[in-house]
């Protein structure tokens, strides 16, 4: 008779979880940051708020963002004036948009990832879907399963309302699933649409205005699995270690609340300070066992919550400017896409590494780190190993 331990052994993969493919997608509507303040104050009927507009213009100028992509066009906003008012009851209108658009955008990214992976979609065993945009039953995971035509017995995990750290969360969960289920192939999708947070400006809620200057829409998808099939599957990164922690004394630093007016969010001014204060401890925990203490010797993928976070992390760790190049590039081209951001940066890094003729997918380096920061204040850490190109 077979023992439980023998069954357990047979159920586990032999090797570590690897990222086998990456796909990304954005809405067609591209917004230029330089002209966005004019558009935003006009569409929200707020042009009389001259000082507030000047303040918003300064926020946009300092954001280090050149462009963003948004589902919300001028036409859609004119048809839904409740979204343009500050705190007007508008949840129904927002929900009607995002329950359709979130899985649709996720499908676009997933189709690209599946194509790169090169295996039939029938080999997908697990699906992780993550979004901060809207809640519904059955969820976006179910809708995506239908849209892609996945098998009805794919094992699904739906993560709602996680926020900006969740790009790390989905990797952590995908790693555990891939390594503990022999032959598992996990489709990971993060899809974010700002229709839940868009609203007119207010003198009394400046952190909402910060969000209007930073957030953009995007979806990213990965295929994750252990023991890649030779000749067919080509690993891009190996996931070595993961952690999640709540930063001490950070309660209320970032939070969001779903209300009749949509998703409202609040952040303390010292969010960059809290992140930079706790980053060293997270790095020591992750890299001391590997004998790495020079953080300029690893590649970097950090959630670009805003330029101030990146600036303070660089300063605290004395990082060379090029360490955050891929991160800043994604922030500049797309804005803050919440959970999808770090997955876009993974894609940017591996493409640029190949284009520049470097030896590995991680800018020619072997080891790297991926950080997610978000509500809590929660920090996700993922240790990555690159793959030879």
Curated annotation (Swiss-Prot):
It comes from the Eukaryota. The active site is at 164. It catalyses: (E)-4-coumaroyl-CoA + 3 malonyl-CoA + 3 H(+) = 2',4,4',6'-tetrahydroxychalcone + 3 CO2 + 4 CoA. It is an enzyme of class 2 (transferase). Keywords: Acyltransferase, Flavonoid biosynthesis, Transferase. One of its GO terms (biological process) is polyketide biosynthetic process. Pathway: Secondary metabolite biosynthesis; flavonoid biosynthesis. The keyword Ubl conjugation does not apply. Its EC number is 2.3.1.74. GO terms for molecular function: naringenin-chalcone synthase activity. The primary product of this enzyme is 4,2',4',6'-tetrahydroxychalcone (also termed naringenin-chalcone or chalcone) which can under specific conditions spontaneously isomerize into naringenin. This is Chalcone synthase 3. The lineage of its organism: Eukaryota, Viridiplantae, Streptophyta, Embryophyta, Tracheophyta.
């Amino acid at each position: 008779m077979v023992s439980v331990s023998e069954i357990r052994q047979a159920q586990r993969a032999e090797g570590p979880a690897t990222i086998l493919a990456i796909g990304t997608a954005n809405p067609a509507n591209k917004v230029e940051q330089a002209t966005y303040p004019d558009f935003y104050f006009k569409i929200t009927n707020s042009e009389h708020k001259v000082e507030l507009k000047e303040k918003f213009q300064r926020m946009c100028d300092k954001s280090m963002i050149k462009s963003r992509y948004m589902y919300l066009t001028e036409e859609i906003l004119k048809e839904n004036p409740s979204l343009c008012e500050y705190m007007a009851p508008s949840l129904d209108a927002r929900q009607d948009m995002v329950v359709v658009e979130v899985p649709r955008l996720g499908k676009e990214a997933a189709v690209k990832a599946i194509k790169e992976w090169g295996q039939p979609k029938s080999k997908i065993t697990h699906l992780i879907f993550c979004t901060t945009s809207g809640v519904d039953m059955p969820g976006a995971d179910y809708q995506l399963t239908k849209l892609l035509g996945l098998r009805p017995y794919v094992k699904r995990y739906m993560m709602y309302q996680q926020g900006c750290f969740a790009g790390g969360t989905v990797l952590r969960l995908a790693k555990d699933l891939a390594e503990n289920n022999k032959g598992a192939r996990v489709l990971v999708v993060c899809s974010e649409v700002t229709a839940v947070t868009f609203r007119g400006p207010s003198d009394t809620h400046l952190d909402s205005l910060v969000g209007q200057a930073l957030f953009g829409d995007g979806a990213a998808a990965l295929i994750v699995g252990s023991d890649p099939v030779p000749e067919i599957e080509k690993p891009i990164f190996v996931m070595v270690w993961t952690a999640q922690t709540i930063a001490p004394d950070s309660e209320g630093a970032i939070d969001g609340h779903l209300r009749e007016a949509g998703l409202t969010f609040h952040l303390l001014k010292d969010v960059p300070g809290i992140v930079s204060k706790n980053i060293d401890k997270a790095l020591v925990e992750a890299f001391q066992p590997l004998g790495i203490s020079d953080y300029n010797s690893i590649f970097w993928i950090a959630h670009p919550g805003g330029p101030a976070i990146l600036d303070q992390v660089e300063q605290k760790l004395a990082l060379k400017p090029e360490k955050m190049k891929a991160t800043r590039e994604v922030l500049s081209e797309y804005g803050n896409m919440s959970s999808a951001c770090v997955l876009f940066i993974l894609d940017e890094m591996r493409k640029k590494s190949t284009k520049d003729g470097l030896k590995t997918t991680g800018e020619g380096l072997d080891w790297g780190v991926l950080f997610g920061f978000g509500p809590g204040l929660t920090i996700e850490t993922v240790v990555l190993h690159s793959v030879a190109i």
